């Protein structure tokens, strides 16, 4: 989180070295989005271990500072919440062994609360090709947090939290259309630079695991209508995806000849939805 804030301040400091500002240097954006999320965990052999699927609503906000017509810095944030349905398999745990032979689908949990937020600081460069077409590219840092609150539905279940700091590079085009419409396809690649997974068992201390090595993509196609006062409204279908490797093994209980612990399996996340926002 601190890395993202430091990066944003460093980018904004570049304004002192730029002599020609854009006519309207500051742009604010507010909006909302609705998306379907599917989260899956996998065994080493590729078989599915569990799935969470549900719908989430988001509140989005951002600010963009243009140093001139080509250089800009952006700070974007999103807070999401919704409910997911869990599908997995029953595990029978005793002092002597763990029996996980039950088939996938033998355990379910409905309407578990899920919260998420994502904040990022980005630099953006825009290259005009002609009056109706330009190319944009950018890079920056982001921080995302996901929280599963299953214990609110089943007190015997456990809660989870994931924190990931990531780097992003992105590119896209801006195409002006008749009647002051615009379409701006964009694609981004995310790479995790630090990841932590936390588990909160009932009546137990926090279990912390390192889970880095994640990567993801974002694809969006904003369709915008510009107004005479310089503001615009945008409708944006989008896709966000992540693939994260298995975490390290964390010992939670130690005995004379062996130890018990936790590991977070490799997982994939898919988010598909639509965003409505207003920029002014």
Where are these regions (language model features)?
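Short glycine/proline- and aromatic-enriched beta-strand/turn motifs that initiate or cap beta-hairpins
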Residues: 21-88, 93-97, 266, 277-280
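Outer-membrane beta-barrel channels and translocator barrels
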Residues: 23, 66-70, 128-132, 176-180, ...
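Extracellular loop and loop/strand-boundary signature of outer-membrane beta-barrel proteins
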Residues: 40-51, 85-87, 96-111, 150-160, ...
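Predominantly the C-terminal beta-signal and adjacent terminal strand-loop region
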Residues: 203-280
């Amino acid at each position: 989180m601190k890395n993202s804030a430091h990066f944003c301040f460093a980018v904004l400091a570049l304004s002192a070295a730029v002599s020609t500002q854009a006519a309207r240097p500051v742009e604010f954006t507010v909006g909302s989005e609705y998306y379907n999320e599917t989260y899956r965990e996998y065994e080493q052999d590729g078989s599915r271990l569990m799935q969470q699927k549900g719908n989430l609503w988001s509140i989005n906000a951002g600010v963009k500072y243009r140093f001139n017509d080509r250089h800009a810095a952006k700070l974007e944030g999103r807070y999401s919440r919704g409910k997911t349905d869990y599908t997995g398999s029953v595990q029978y745990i005793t002092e002597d062994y763990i029996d996980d032979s039950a088939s996938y689908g033998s355990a379910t949990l409905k309407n578990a609360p899920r919260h998420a937020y994502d904040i990022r600081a980005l630099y953006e460069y825009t290259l005009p090709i002609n009056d109706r077409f330009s190319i944009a590219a950018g890079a920056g840092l982001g921080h995302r947090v996901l929280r599963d609150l299953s214990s609110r539905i089943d007190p015997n279940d456990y809660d989870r939290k994931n924190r990931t700091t990531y780097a992003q590079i992105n590119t896209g085009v801006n195409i002006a259309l008749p009647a002051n419409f615009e379409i701006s396809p964009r694609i981004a690649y995310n790479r995790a630079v630090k990841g932590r997974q936390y588990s909160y068992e009932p009546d137990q201390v926090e279990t912390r695991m390192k889970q880095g090595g994640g990567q993801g993509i974002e694809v969006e196609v904003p369709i915008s209508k510009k107004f005479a006062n310089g503001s615009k409204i945008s409708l944006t279908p989008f896709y966000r995806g992540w693939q994260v490797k298995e975490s390290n093994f964390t010992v939670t209980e130690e005995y004379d000849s062996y130890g018990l612990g936790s590991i977070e399996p490799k997982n994939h996340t898919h988010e598909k939805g639509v965003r409505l926002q207003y920029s002014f």
